[in-house]
Amino acid sequence: GLRLHDSYEALLADPGVAAVYVPLPNHLHVEWALKAIAAGKHVLCEKPMAMQAAEFDALNAARDASGLLVSEAYMIVHHPQWQKARELIAGGAIGRVEHVDAAFSYDNRAQPGNIRNRPETGGGGIRDIGVYTYGSVRFATGAEPVALQARLKRENGVDTFAQVTGEMAGEVGRFTYSA
């Protein structure tokens, strides 16, 4: 059966808990992932795992020292539709990929208090959905970018729109998100 805990600390102190999922607002990911690692728990952390490269390095160091599994919850690589797209492209079923357009959008501007709209909680479109446009093309094609050009729009301290055009190993990709 499931056990309920009245705090995150109590959850981490429970010897019957082997792993935790960290779905908190972005700015809390590193803090609670590190606490979970220190408590000897495997960690599945919502994206983005960290807000800064140095924080990510600290997570990697803690993971390496602990021997625990620590992973980012990133749906693209595990989703059957993207696995199939990768298989079809790699096998040549659709011919040579020359251009890819990827877009992801939703409108949450009517919710200014939403954590995705607040800079202090790590909000912004690139951290929330922008990664899916770029990541899906990169995963499906197996191509890495060699040049990028971007346009970005910000409102109230967070990015709400971006369009990135990239050259990816002979292909051209355009990645757009708006939030």
Task: Specify the residue positions occupied by each region the protein language model found.
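Alpha-helical elements of Rossmann-like donor-binding domains used by nucleotide-donor carbohydrate transfer enzymes
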Residues: A10, A19, E31, A58, ...
